[in-house]
C-alpha cells in the first residue's frame, strides 16, 4: 500500500504543472490533463486512477465550485465531475451520432465515465465534448 501511495503521489506531482485550465460557459471549471504526454506510461497508477487523484485534489482546492476533470490520451478520455450534472452515456451517444468517422464509444454515470474514439479525431471529439459539458446544468 505504501509503495502504491508513493507511486500515485509521484505521478500526481509530475502531471499537476501540466494541467490545462478553463472556465466553461456554464461557470464550471474544466481541468484537462494529457496522461500520455505528462504521466508515466505502462505503470501504476493507470490513466483513470491518475485522473481521479488529480480531480480529487482539484475538488479540495476549489471547494464548493463545479469541477470537471478530463484525463485524455491519443484515443480515450476519462471524465470526472463534481457539481456538474453531466449525463455521460447520453453525451457519448450524441457524439457518436454527430461526428462521423470518430468511432466514439464508452459510457459511465452522471459524474464519472470514459470515452473511446479513433486517434485522428481526438481534437474534434474533445472540443465537442467540452461544448456539451459547458451546457450541462450546474
Regions found by a protein language model. Give the residues of each.
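Glycine-rich, acidic loop segments that terminate in or are immediately followed by a histidine
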Residues: 3-138
Amino acid at each position: 500500500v505504501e509503495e502504491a501511495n508513493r507511486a500515485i503521489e509521484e505521478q500526481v506531482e509530475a502531471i499537476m504543472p501540466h494541467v490545462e485550465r478553463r472556465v466553461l460557459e456554464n461557470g464550471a471549471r474544466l481541468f484537462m490533463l494529457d496522461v500520455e504526454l505528462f504521466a508515466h506510461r505502462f505503470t501504476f497508477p493507470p490513466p483513470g486512477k491518475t485522473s481521479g487523484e488529480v480531480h480529487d485534489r482539484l475538488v479540495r482546492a476549489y471547494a464548493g465550485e463545479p469541477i470537471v476533470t478530463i484525463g485524455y490520451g491519443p484515443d480515450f478520455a476519462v471524465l470526472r465531475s463534481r457539481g456538474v450534472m453531466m449525463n455521460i452515456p447520453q453525451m457519448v451517444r450524441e457524439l457518436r451520432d454527430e461526428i462521423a468517422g470518430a468511432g466514439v464509444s464508452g459510457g459511465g454515470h452522471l459524474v464519472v465515465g470514459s470515452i473511446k474514439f479513433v486517434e485522428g479525431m481526438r481534437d474534434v471529439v474533445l472540443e465537442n465534448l467540452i461544448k456539451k459539458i459547458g451546457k450541462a446544468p450546474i
